């Protein structure tokens, strides 16, 4: 009986022993990560280039946003606006189930894509599928990876180089876009027609034939860069 009692006590101690794998509480870790991400956002001297993809499953493609963060205020520019136009609004970094970046007050350069359009016949309250709240997946001094909270698109921000101005950068992107004025392309292999590629917004709709002549179609998102 004595040995049995010892075994039972040993089992009980194993069953109820919890090991703390972290040096700090989850609340303190979350607070520290919010502080770390906030400092990284503000530390980029010339701001960030955001590769902003729009639409469910990237269905409208990507545009360039430029962002400069400073003490809860963000200044933004975009390839879809004038090259010298900037818009400022409020942002926050907070902890929910993960560390989040949220553009809190209205900034048409980003919120336009997430607001009801009213002109969609099938859904007057439908949006273009753009997020303005993001889970911060990874963050370093040079690169921050985000995931849209609602639509789930992967968004990458890269620290903007200090050797050019925002206006110069956006002007170059606009020139690349203006020079790419063709919207329809034939696909050929060894001189034989194999399909067609149509540009729609910032995507290519690719229609092609396989080796048995069956038609396939897929949408490929893209964005203009310099």
Where are the language model's segments positioned?
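Sec-dependent signal peptide recognition
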Residues: 1-4
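C-terminal motif of bacterial Sec signal peptides marking the signal peptidase cleavage site
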Residues: 10-13
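Acidic/polar, low-complexity intrinsically disordered N-terminal segments immediately downstream
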Residues: 15-100, 108, 139, 162-183
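Short, solvent-exposed coil/turn segments at beta-strand boundaries
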Residues: 43, 66-75, 97, 136-144, ...
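Short, flexible beta-strand-to-coil junctions
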Residues: 51-59, 79-81, 139, 147-153, ...
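Contiguous, well-ordered beta-strand patches that form the walls/edges
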Residues: 77-131, 206-226
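Hydrophobic, ordered structural segments
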Residues: 128-157
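Preference for solvent-exposed, low-hydrophobicity sequence contexts
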Residues: 154, 158-226
